[in-house]
Amino acid sequence: TLERAEKYLNTIVLGYPQQSVIYYGLRGVGKTVLLNAIECKTDDMPILMGHIEIAEKRNFTQQITNYSKKFIHKMSFKETAKDFVSRVQDLLKAFTVTYNPEDQSFKVGMEEREYIVTGDLSEDLTDLFVAMGKMADKTGYAICFFVDEIQYMKEEEIAALVNAIHRCNQLRLPLMIFGAGLPKILKTLGKVKSYSERLFRFEEIDALSGQDAKDAIVKPAEPLGGSYTEEALRWIISETQGYPYFIQELCSAIWEHLNPEQTVIGIDDVKGAVLKFYENLDRGFYRLRYDRCTPKEKMFIFAMAKCEKLPCSISNVAKIMETEVSSISPYRAQLINKSMIYATGYAEIDFTVPEFDQFLKRLNPELQLDEVEKVQKGDAGDE
């Protein structure tokens, strides 16, 4: 995957437009790590790179304008940029004043601006991207935005981003996006723009298997002089299901309990760390997400865990909760909005966090819905 991404970067640097890329998968599969690794590949390339993390307290348009200022400033030193600088800067001023009025870096009156933005984010972001793309083309640069947690973008923002990328592709401009997010981003992109599937390469990031899983365990230990027996490796891969974050946490728990002089890790060392491994996951990785749910939402996810298999249908969840589908549909929507679950197909849902149903079983072994309130209060499985 990293090698393919490097080819995409090399190709766009040579002036050939590239499809943007969306990496999607469950929590803990290494999407952000991959995105960061691709970013590092741009260090020695003529690529202007911006990392955008979508979060409640981090404004998308503000992050776009901040990076755009840096990109335009850097390109402005090129002799070939002189015919573009004033026009692109003027467009950026208009965009900034409209969408980020609290930004005081551009104190400019309407009469001083050549460009007046429309107030339609899709049109205005497209104008900005096209202007920067043309400037990059003339100055020998490519522009790449890396967007993490892309599923949290508002639909209006995603529609604008897709429209801007689409226009840049039509004009064969060297500007592309690498995005990473949960599986629900596929449905969102299809919803906002029907042609999204032509604009993006969608690459699923899943659990590691075979040699990749072994490498994730063995290679970090090599600089420390450590090694694993084959039996220990098999046990770790089985216990973690190959999920990179789980491998990291289990190996960390193993190393914490090793004798300082020990270099070979065996099956007993792995077994001795398993309890600590699950305690760490339950108190952090899982609990952080569980605590964001309301009591009713918790009943919903416990009912999901009680289904015979996952993904499960919402009708099955309703049956377990002894209610109608219409009564629990709002909880489904809320949980999807919180990125706790996602729709895997027609009327089917699953958790976005690997093995989340097993965590719920550790909290409430019998998965009794009438016990959820006790779990909520910490009477079962807390700390």
Where on the chain are the PLM-derived regions?
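Pre-Walker A adenine-sensing motif
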Residues: L2-L14
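Helix-loop-helix "sensor" segment of P-loop NTPases
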Residues: I12, I185-S238, N259-Q262
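P-loop NTPase nucleotide-binding core
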Residues: P17-G25, V29, V33-F145, L173-L175
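Conserved nucleotide-binding/hydrolysis micro-motifs of P-loop NTPases
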Residues: I22, G28, A55-N59, Y152, ...
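Amphipathic helix/helix-loop-helix segment enriched in hydrophobic residues with interspersed Lys/Arg
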Residues: G133, I247, L258-V274
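Sensor-1/coupling segment of RecA-like P-loop NTPase cores
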Residues: D137-T139, I143-F146, Y152-A160, A164-S194
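C-terminal leucine-rich, beta-strand-based interaction scaffolds used for sensing/assembly
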Residues: E231, D268-E383
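C-terminal helical "lid" of AAA+/P-loop NTPase domains
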Residues: L233-E239, Y245-P260, M299-F302, S315, ...
